[in-house]
């Protein structure tokens, strides 16, 4: 998939199913991507009880956050989420994984591609006649790949809830030929060697 395009969806039957809510770093990022769309229409919030409005309009300090959280650097560091446009660093041995909320787009309206060390996710709705006007939604999100990830191994899947899960295994570290962690020198005359 490096420097090429692959129409969505892409499925790998040999891949086991994963639970995106299992990993705590992942669950803190699930609702980060709102693409500038309000999570609730203005007329809907007018009928909410007084006790619910502060919870909907302020930053929630829980694991999952609403789409109304300010996107400042303090919010990012407080929740352990990397700066905007950067992908989270993978843990050693864990696959690199990012979720993008695309619930308002159909699978055929999404495109996932890799180019120049980035994964680019884009979506576009066809124009629709709605409320006396024409409505069209589109977005593009670029996510930088970590150095430990090979762009050819990136794959994406769409959950029933509308989360686009982008994953790639880490490239195992390698050592140049002749370098290794064990000592490959022969013992000198003064050294004792035990063979078993």
From Swiss-Prot:
Q: Name one GO cellular component term.
A: cytosol
Top-level division of the source organism's lineage: Eukaryota
Carrying Phosphothreonine, the residues are: 63
Record note on modification: Phosphorylated.
Annotated spans, Disordered = 1-34, 176-196
GO BP: any one term: positive regulation of aggrephagy
Name positions with the PTM Phosphoserine.
24, 57, 87
Identify a single GO molecular function assigned to this protein: protein homodimerization activity
Q: Which residues carry this modification: Asymmetric dimethylarginine?
A: 71, 78
Instruction: Tell me which InterPro entries the record gives.
Output: A-crystallin/Hsp20_dom, Alpha-crystallin/sHSP_animal, HSP20-like_chaperone, HSPB8, HspB8_ACD
| Keyword terms | Chaperone, Cytoplasm, Methylation, Nucleus, Phosphoprotein, Stress response
Q: Does the keyword Glycosyltransferase apply?
A: no
Regions of compositional bias (Polar residues) in chain numbering: 178-196
Q: Where in the cell is it found?
A: Cytoplasm; Nucleus
Which segments show compositional bias classed as Low complexity? Answer: 23-34
Q: Which Pfam families match?
A: HSP20
Q: Where is the sHSP domain?
A: 74-185
Would you identify the family this protein belongs to, as annotated? Belongs to the small heat shock protein (HSP20) family.
Query: Subunit structure of this entry?
Result: Monomer. Forms a ternary complex with BAG3 and HSPA1A. Component of the chaperone-assisted selective autophagy (CASA) complex consisting of BAG3, HSPA8/HSC70, HSPB8 and STUB1/CHIP. Interacts with HSPB1. Interacts with DNAJB6. Interacts with BAG3.
- Stated role: Involved in the chaperone-assisted selective autophagy (CASA), a crucial process for protein quality control, particularly in mechanical strained cells and tissues such as muscle. Displays temperature-dependent chaperone activity.
What name does the UniProt record give this protein?
Heat shock protein beta-8
Q: State the species of origin.
A: Bos taurus (Bovine)
